[in-house]
Amino acid sequence: MRMKKTVAVIGAGNVGEHVASLILLKNLANVKMFDLPRKTEEKVFEPVKGKALDMKQMLAAMDIDARVEGYTVTPEGEGYEPLEGSDIVVITAGFPRRPGMSREDLLEANIRIISVIADRIKRYAPDAIVIVVTNPVDVMTYVAYKLLNFPKNRVMGMAGVLDSARFKTFISEELMVSPKDIHAYVIGGHGDEMVPLISISNVGGIPLKDLLPKEKLEKIIERTRFGGGEIVNLMGTSAYYAPAAAIVDMIEALVQNSKRILPCSVYLDGEAGEYYGVQGFCVGVPVKLGSNGVEEIIKVPMIEEEREMWRRSVESVKKTVEVAEGILSAGSSRQ
């Protein structure tokens, strides 16, 4: 019987805690959660330990034989020693964008967080596969890749799996068919410039463009692009059920060595980079996921209209990467 893998989840907020609970409910792996304390004037709370205890009792109630622990850490990086032995590390920790905060402010704040976490992963889990969720995800995946100095197959970002799930949801609602029978990919940067690949999307083998008129497809694409914002406007907070499920989809492929083809943000260079017109940064493309991480980058065909959308998406990510490079350089020169 093979040893159960261990997944570390850094950041046990809405997304992180749902990732942990889904992993446990599917009995995919043991889980370690890491998060900051919550301080009030009267008391210092350790919510991550409380969540882990709650999940232990959930497992007992459901007769699931898995382990979960919660560890309180500091912003400076103390308390990460239990990362040791983790096979997969998921980074969900990060600041959301707040009113009055520029994109550069957000970048700088989250680069600081990723820098501390990357250092601790290198120290305690040097053989782990790392999944980055912190936004802006393509840029933070690149930052993590550069700071970790891991082989590129072991660092990836979650974006396209979620965007593709949203795309499939809206197609499913429009056509009144099961999402299981819809094959559709969204690639590119995780943002307004994402690229839904209509030309290769199909429902039960029938091309999507033969089932929906262009104007309806355009509305679905627009809704997909702003799918996260739609949820924020309804709930007053970011989505977490679907992002968590998308992350667990990736984890399942890694743990079970299932060779799934999933769109992930990965570092592109060489032959694959030449095909996609990207050299030296991370952006979302279909990849084969297995026990070694990213085992192959799939070269997906695109029609000219999609190629143009792809170029715009890549350019948008590249500009933000350049800003991040400046922040990283400034940070290293201060040390």
From Swiss-Prot:
Q: What family does this chain come from, according to its entry?
A: Belongs to the LDH/MDH superfamily. MDH type 3 family.
Q: Which HAMAP family match?
A: Malate_dehydrog_3
Q: What Pfam families is this protein classified in?
A: Ldh_1_C, Ldh_1_N
Q: This protein is called what?
A: Malate dehydrogenase 1
Biological process per Gene Ontology, one example term: tricarboxylic acid cycle
| Binding, substrate | 97, 103, 135, 166
Explain the purpose of this protein: Catalyzes the reversible oxidation of malate to oxaloacetate.
Q: What class of enzyme is it?
A: oxidoreductase
**Residue positions of the active site:** 190 (proton acceptor)
- Organism equals Aquifex aeolicus (strain VF5)
Q: Which UniProt keywords apply?
A: NAD, Oxidoreductase, Tricarboxylic acid cycle
Checking PANTHER family in the record gives: L-2-HYDROXYCARBOXYLATE DEHYDROGENASE (NAD(P)(+)), L-LACTATE DEHYDROGENASE
